[in-house]
């Protein structure tokens, strides 16, 4: 289970040093084998391999006849990269994925249960500002009655 937010720096070889709390979960759930893919929100999604496999299976079963479904499948499955975390807990992010998410030196990791989102720092700050600007009237219907 991934939760919490952490900011980390890519090293000189564009490797992401996974924080210990996430690293331990990745080792337990997938032996350090991860899948990193693009998200429509222009961040990256990092899944332990066992968490990604059922998602990929569902995606590839979708019809290509619906253009929106096909586009989403192309994005999520097309950009997916299998990556092994090294013994120092680092993940080498492929150039195409770094470019997609506009990742530079600082990367924000956001735990989201079964996955971790990887954000460009400025884009993450904009995402937080947008989340804070919601009014009670603008909440999606699925959140009606939800309390913290």
UniProtKB/Swiss-Prot annotation:
SUPFAM superfamilies named among the record's database cross-references: AbrB/MazE/MraZ-like
Organism: Thiobacillus denitrificans (strain ATCC 25259 / T1)
Record Gene3D superfamilies: Transcriptional regulator MraZ domain (3.40.1550.20)
NCBIfam families tied to this protein: division/cell wall cluster transcriptional repressor MraZ
Alphabetical list of HAMAP family matching this protein: MraZ
Gene Ontology biological process terms in this record: negative regulation of DNA-templated transcription initiation
Family assignment from sequence similarity: Belongs to the MraZ family.
Pfam families: MraZ (PF02381)
Source organism superkingdom: Bacteria
Coiled-coil features, chain-numbered ranges: none
GO cellular component: cytoplasm; nucleoid
Domain SpoVT-AbrB intervals: 5-51, 80-123
Subunit structure: Forms oligomers.
Protein name: Transcriptional regulator MraZ
InterPro entries in the cross-refs: MraZ, MraZ_C, MraZ_dom, MraZ_N, MraZ_sf, SpoVT-AbrB_dom, SpoVT-AbrB_sf
GO molecular function (one): transcription cis-regulatory region binding
Main location: cytoplasm
Subcellular location: Cytoplasm, Nucleoid
Keywords annotated in UniProt: Cytoplasm, DNA-binding, Repeat, Transcription, Transcription regulation
């Amino acid at each position: 289970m991934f939760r919490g937010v952490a900011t980390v720096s890519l090293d000189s070889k564009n490797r992401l040093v996974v924080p210990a709390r996430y690293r331990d979960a990745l080792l337990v759930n997938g032996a350090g084998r991860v899948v990193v893919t693009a998200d429509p929100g222009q961040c990256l999604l990092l899944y332990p391999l066992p968490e990604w496999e059922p998602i990929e299976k569902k995606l590839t079963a979708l019809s290509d006849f619906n253009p929106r479904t096909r586009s989403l499948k192309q994005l999520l499955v097309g950009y997916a990269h299998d990556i092994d975390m090294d013994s120092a807990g680092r993940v080498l992010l492929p150039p195409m994925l770094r470019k997609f998410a506009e990742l530079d030196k600082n990367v924000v990791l956001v735990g989201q249960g079964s996955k971790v989102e990887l954000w460009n720092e400025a884009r993450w700050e904009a995402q937080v500002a947008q989340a804070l600007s919601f009014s009670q009237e603008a909440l999606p219907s699925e959140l009606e009655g939800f309390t913290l």
